[in-house]
C-alpha cells in the first residue's frame, strides 16, 4: 500500500445557479493576458449542451483519454507511430471555432468618432488579429441556458433519447462547473514528449513546467476534458493550477472562495497509489466503485502510518480526518467523478442534482402529497443521462445517491415542520438520523472552515535555523570580467 495525499474538490450540482462568478474570478486572476484570452480554466456549462470547447466529450472525434489494450492502458490517439507522425501537427486538437475567436470592443470610438447623423457604436474586433468582426460567432458560454435547443442540446453526447428536449413537459436543464480534474492517471502528462507536465507529490496538483514545455500540444489532444490550453503568444501549454499559491497557505481556490451558491468543498483525500492502474482497467460501469476503493480511511492507524512513511505530515492527516470531501465521496458515496470512462482517474467529484417531477406522469401534488417519495423514473433529469455523465453508465450508483438525497429532504422536512417521519425512509437509503443531520449541515449552513479543510503546505514546517545554515546570505559571486 503506497499512501499518497491529494487536494480534491467536490461540486454539489444541486446548488449551482449558473452565475459564472467562479469563471470570472478565475479569469481575472490567471488568464487575463495576451495569448490566454480564450482560456477558461474554470467554466460553467449548461447541460444538455455541447460544452466548451464544443463537444469536448466526443472522444471519437478528439481521441482523448485512455483505452484498455488487453491487460494494459494506452492513450487513445497516441503511440510511437502517431507521436512521430504528428510531432508538428495535431489533427485531433480542437480548432479555434471549437472555442471562439476572443474579441473586445472599440470603446474609444464612442467618444472619438467623427460627428455625424448616426450614433457611434463600439465595434467588435478580434483580440488575435486585431481585425474588425462583423458578426460574433461564439463565446465561452454561447449555449448558456439553451438546454432545449436543437442546435446545441441535441448534440450532447450524453443525451441518449433526443426526444426529451422536443417537449416542454420533459426537457430539463442543469449546470456543470468544470476545472482541471488533477487526475491520478493524467493523459496530458503521459502524452508530453518533453515531460513538461508533472503531478506534485505533496498535494497531487498537476502543473506544466513553462521552462520545459516546447509547445508540442500533445497534452491538449490527450486531455479528454480539454482543460489544457495552448498559449499562442508564448507557445506554451497552460492549465488550471488549482490556485496552488493559495492552497499552499491554507486558503481555498479563487473559484471556491467566490462561489455564490457555496457548491464547492475542498479537502484532503488519502489514496493507494499502487491500485491506480488496476482501478483504471475496470469495466466502464465498475469504475466508480474502483475509484472509491482507492480512497483510504484517514482514521485507520495503518493508513496513517503508511502516509507518514511517505512524508505526509500530521497536519495533513488531521485535515484528512476532517475532510468534507472524504465524507461526500467515500463515507456516503454521494459524489462521483466526471466521465470515469476516460480512465484518467479524475479527482474532482460531483454530487448529482435532484430535479422536479415530470408533469407528464400525473398531478405533481397527488404524487408528492405529504412527503411521499417520488419514484426515480419520474424525475425530470433522466437517470441514464446522469449515469452517462458521472458513472460510466452505472445506473445503480446514481440511484443510490439520489435516494439518499431524497430521503434527506423528506427527513429534514419533517424535522422543520415538526411532523413524524418514518425511520424506514432513512434506513432504506442507507442513512441514519445522525448522518442525515451531518449532511444537512454540510449542504446548508456549514461555514467556510467546514467546507474547506486545507492544511498549509508541508514545506513551511522546515526549521528556519537549518534553512539559514544551508542557504547562506544568498550573495551571487561574480567572476572576474563580469560587470
Predicted segment positions?
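Non-ligating segments of multi-cofactor redox enzymes
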Residues: 1-483
Amino acid at each position: 500500500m503506497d499512501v499518497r495525499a491529494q487536494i480534491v474538490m467536490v461540486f454539489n450540482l444541486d446548488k449551482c445557479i449558473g452565475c459564472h462568478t467562479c469563471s470570472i474570478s478565475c479569469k481575472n486572476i490567471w488568464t487575463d493576458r495576451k495569448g490566454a484570452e480564450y482560456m477558461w480554466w474554470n467554466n460553467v456549462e449548461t447541460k444538455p449542451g455541447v460544452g466548451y470547447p464544443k463537444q469536448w466529450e466526443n472522444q471519437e472525434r478528439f481521441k482523448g483519454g485512455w483505452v484498455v489494450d488487453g491487460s494494459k492502458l494506452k492513450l487513445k490517439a497516441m503511440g510511437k507511430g502517431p507521436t512521430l507522425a504528428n510531432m508538428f501537427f495535431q489533427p485531433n486538437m480542437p480548432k479555434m471555432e471549437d472555442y471562439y475567436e476572443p474579441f473586445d470592443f472599440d470603446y474609444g470610438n464612442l467618444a472619438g468618432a467623427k460627428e455625424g447623423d448616426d450614433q457611434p457604436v463600439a465595434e467588435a474586433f478580434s483580440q488575435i488579429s486585431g481585425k474588425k468582426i462583423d458578426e460574433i460567432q461564439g463565446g465561452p458560454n454561447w449555449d448558456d441556458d439553451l438546454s432545449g435547443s436543437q442546435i446545441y442540446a441535441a448534440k450532447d453526447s450524453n443525451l441518449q433519447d433526443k426526444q426529451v428536449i422536443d417537449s416542454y413537459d420533459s426537457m430539463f436543464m442543469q449546470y456543470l462547473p468544470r476545472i482541471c480534474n488533477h487526475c491520478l492517471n493524467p493523459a496530458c502528462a503521459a502524452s508530453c514528449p518533453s515531460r513538461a507536465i508533472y503531478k506534485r507529490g505533496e498535494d497531487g496538483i498537476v502543473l506544466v513546467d513553462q521552462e520545459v514545455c516546447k509547445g508540442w500540444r500533445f497534452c491538449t489532444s490527450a486531455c479528454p476534458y480539454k482543460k489544457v490550453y495552448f498559449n499562442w503568444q508564448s507557445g506554451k501549454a497552460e492549465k488550471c493550477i488549482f490556485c496552488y499559491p493559495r492552497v499552499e497557505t491554507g486558503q481555498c481556490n479563487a473559484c471556491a472562495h467566490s462561489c455564490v451558491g457555496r457548491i464547492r468543498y475542498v479537502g484532503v483525500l488519502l489514496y493507494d497509489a499502487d491500485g491506480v492502474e488496476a482501478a483504471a482497467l475496470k469495466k466502464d460501469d465498475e469504475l466508480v466503485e474502483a475509484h472509491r476503493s482507492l480512497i483510504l480511511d484517514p482514521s485507520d492507524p495503518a493508513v496513517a502510518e503508511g502516509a507518514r512513511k511517505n512524508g505526509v505530515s500530521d497536519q495533513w492527516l488531521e485535515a484528512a480526518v476532517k475532510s468534507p470531501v472524504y465524507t461526500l465521496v467515500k463515507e456516503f458515496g454521494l459524489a462521483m467523478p466526471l466521465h470515469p470512462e476516460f480512465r484518467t482517474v479524475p479527482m474532482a467529484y460531483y454530487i448529482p442534482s435532484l430535479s422536479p417531477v415530470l408533469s407528464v406522469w400525473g398531478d405533481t401534488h397527488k404524487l408528492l402529497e405529504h412527503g411521499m417519495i417520488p419514484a426515480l423514473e419520474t424525475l425530470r433529469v433522466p437517470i441514464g443521462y446522469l449515469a452517462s455523465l458521472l458513472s460510466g453508465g452505472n445506473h445503480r450508483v446514481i440511484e443510490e445517491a439520489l435516494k439518499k438525497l431524497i430521503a434527506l429532504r423528506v427527513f429534514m422536512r419533517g424535522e422543520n415542520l415538526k411532523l413524524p417521519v418514518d425511520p424506514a425512509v432513512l434506513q432504506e437509503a442507507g442513512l441514519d438520523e445522525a448522518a442525515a443531520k451531518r449532511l444537512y449541515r454540510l449542504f446548508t449552513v456549514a461555514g467556510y472552515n467546514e467546507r474547506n479543510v486545507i492544511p498549509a503546505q508541508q514545506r513551511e514546517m522546515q526549521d528556519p535555523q537549518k534553512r539559514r545554515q544551508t542557504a547562506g546570505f544568498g550573495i551571487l559571486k561574480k567572476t572576474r570580467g563580469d560587470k
